[in-house]
Regions:
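Surface-exposed, low-hydrophobicity interaction/linker segments
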Residues: 49-125
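Generic structural motif
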Residues: 14-16, 41, 91, 128-130, ...
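Short, flexible coil/linker elements and helix-boundary hinge sites characteristic
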Residues: 35, 61, 76, 149-150
Length: 163
């Protein structure tokens, strides 16, 4: 995405009864519009989680379709715990295309020179310390966040609320 400016939005996880599914739903079933590279994640696995799903989700640099991610979340198979980076990449992405890049994730998502973890990424959802979801996106997508997730705040306002 080059040198494009990124906007950052933050949401307290406690205000989202269905967690990540609420973000997806508010943003027009966002998960179905992309495939997802999931890295730096810690997950809880439900008692009903099939062994194959547990093993798959334990991989680093996991590539998953939005449909599959939604199914696992809705079924209660998985839940993100302390952290995760979910990078939206174009639909139909092949795992070998994703593996061409070593994920480079920058903790300072508010930095003016923040870069997505791969050049294929269109937006990122970051679970910050287990209690806040962060949306990093371009200005056009930012307008959608503002209109459909009014509880999302820019980082300065978000941190001030915890002041």
């Amino acid at each position: 995405m080059g040198e494009e400016h990124m906007d950052v939005w933050m949401l307290n996880r406690k205000i989202l009864p269905n967690d990540l599914l609420d973000i997806f739903s508010a943003l027009g079933n966002l998960q179905a519009q992309y495939d997802w590279v999931i890295t730096d994640h810690s997950m809880w696995y439900g008692k009903n989680c099939p062994e194959a799903v547990c093993k798959r989700c334990q991989r680093a640099g996991l590539l998953m379709t939005g449909r599959e991610l939604t199914e696992h979340l809705r079924a209660g198979y998985v839940w993100f715990l302390d952290g995760a980076v979910l990078s939206a990449v174009p639909l139909g992405m092949r795992e070998e295309d994703v593996n061409l890049y070593e994920p480079v994730w920058d903790v300072d998502f508010c930095a003016p020179d923040y870069r997505f973890q791969t050049p294929l990424t269109r937006l990122e959802l970051i679970l910050f310390d287990g209690w806040a979801w962060v949306i990093v996106c371009n200005a056009a997508f930012s307008k959608l966040v503002q209109s459909r997730l009014p509880q999302a705040q820019p980082p300065d306002a978000f941190w001030k609320a915890f002041g």
